Amino acid sequence: MQISFEEEQQIFHLYNDKISYVIQVEKQRYLKHCYYGKRIKRWHSGIKDYYYDRGFCANPIAEDRTFSLDTQLREFPESGQGDFRSPAYELEDRNGDKNARFFYNGYRILSGKIAPDGLPHVYTDADTEAMTLEITLQDKVRNQRILLYYTIYEDAAVTRFAKWINDGTEPIEICRFLSMNMDLPTQEYDVLTLSGAHTEEKNVYRRPLCADSVTIESSRGTSSPQATPFIGLLSPGTTEEQGEVLGVNLIYSGNFYGCVQCGQYGTIRVQLGINPYQFGWQLAPGTSFCTPEAVLVYSVNGLAGMSNIFHRLYRTRVCRGWYRDRERPVLLNSWEGMYFEINEEKMLTLAEEAAELGIELLVMDDGWFKGRNTDTTSLGDWTEDKKKFPDGLQSLAEKVKQKGIDFGIWFEPEMISRESDLYREHPDWVIRSPLYEPILSRHQLVLDLSNPAVCEYLIDAVSKVLVPGNISYVKWDMNRHLTDLGSAYLDRKNQNELSHRYVLGLYQVMETLTERFPQVLFESCSSGGGRFDAGMLYYMPQTWTSDNTDEVCRLKIQHGTSFLFPTVTMGAHVSACPNHQVGRTTPLATRFAVAAAGNLGYELDLKKLLKEEKKEVREQIAEYKRRRRTVQFGTYYRLADSFQENQSAWNIVSEDGMEVIFTHVQILARSAYRVPVIRLKGLDPDAVYTDCETGQEYGGDELMYAGIRIPRIRQDFSSTTMVLRKS
């Protein structure tokens, strides 16, 4: 990868073998976005497409009526200078003046990666993996600087963030500060977003961009199940394999805002960053503020190409630590099998049964701590319930491990119950208005993580449970969103900082704990996939994808999640039937087929399984272990879309290309059966592949071009799985 600067024409060119990103300095002041896309050798600097004398446009350079900021393709636009589209940043001084004039004031080209302070980001293992461009914008009147950071890698990705520095003598308030802005010259795109609801996360929405705007956002305190900080721009007709795709994703776990805004002259503006709603940051003299990092991915190979870039980047350069490259264990979670009805005897019986089936990790979910028999009490009091565990938690963990199985535990550290010792001792640690009774959700309140004392308490409380070393896994949950925004810790002028400071506090807590316990596998959760984002993956390398364990619903949820996140980050469980969320009954084989497309787990009462079902589960687990490396670290391809069809299908190709796992799920059986033809992807067309079960041989070109015909099965929710070996 390289970054060049052409002095005469003031052109920056970031490029590698796959992509180019071009920026030009206009009028010695303004940054113009020129190009982001397939690699080009040079940019013709004479292009002046947007220089016209247009009526009703402001002219910042009085003698040039052809130049207006409202018509230009901008890189990081301000407000108040005649560009009436959405700005990337805004401020307000102590006199209420919101005007600012940041102009270009220099650059640096650096080897390696510059990281945003205190925030998750794409990292590098060596400086040779990346190059970074730092561009300085300065308001000399206010004595303020904004540094724009662009990092390019070997893959088709660029990361961006911005840093605001107050060099003046007076404080200012940052009212809006986005991570990225990019203006594009045409509106000929489809827009792809991932939205949904609790237990219906990451639904795929695609629509043509018209002469209006598309906005995505969360103001819930987290990235949320209702929205995802992602925007995809697709050239018309783009498919999984073909077409241009520009994908933008934010590495952040809090409130976010994104938009695709249509301009009056056929251009568009793409933005992503912290949601300016209820946001403000007091920037004192001599201090700075960093935005979260945005990831920009470009693909000429359709949606699959975009996903593969995100998958490689997030698995190897966002996920970190001991488990980054290690296979994840097959687990049994106690929640749907027992709910709050747990004790030492039941857990030991469960451990023995689980070990006999080949399960490697027993996770004790909610209900283990002092007085926790319902969801109305005890959050915050992270000590074991002596009535349920008279010999203590560590004794239980040791006994479980003696049965040949690891032990994990559930926490919800960010929450507090009114009926708890912690609340009685520290009622001021709760996020709430000083005027009103706080609103409950799931009978619980949210701890104020902007307060360092709260963060230290959480680190200490979780550490006391983990220090003895018998617990190898933590499920970190968050089962409500933020309301009644108010902090007893923050000053009045800093109250609008609360939502962002909450996220910064959370990141600091997780950074400390994951460094302190590097061999504990942390899995994040927020009532399922309510905080499934790249920010959380920086600290916890896998996420519980959804609280909805129905395999038919999971087809869509996991399909949508796969646009950004690799299979090894997705928790997926086989649960009981009828399903506890929707009441549907589905075959055990199909439940396994869907769950086996992620980190496999089981979430049911093993005692209720019939003898033949236990035999089937034992065989499932053995089969998954045989192919686990391929599932978790292979390249994933979507083949059929259950949002559009009565089926879903995918295949995964191992890292070395020697193994292929193909899965097809029929949703509803039909009398007038249409034989599905599914074309596999990512194979070697010149190779021969052998079906490991039947011995049948296929050509790679046959599987990819002619495809596989799925025979008729007269049963709803049926599945077919084929494991192929390359000869």
Regions found by a protein language model. Name each.
Residues F5, Q9-H13, D17, L31-Q261, ...:
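Polysaccharide-binding surfaces and accessory modules of carbohydrate-active proteins
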Residues D70, E75, G80-K113, E240-G254, ...:
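Glycine-rich, aromatic-flanked loop segments that form ligand/cofactor-binding clefts
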Residues D97-Y104, W281-V300, S718-R725:
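Short Pro-Gly-centered flexible turn/kink motifs
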Residues Y323-D460, Y473:
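Aromatic-lined carbohydrate-binding/catalytic grooves of carbohydrate-active enzymes
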Residues S417, L422-E456, H500-K607:
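Glycan-recognition surfaces
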Residues L668-S727:
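C-terminal beta-sandwich/jelly-roll accessory domains of carbohydrate-active enzymes
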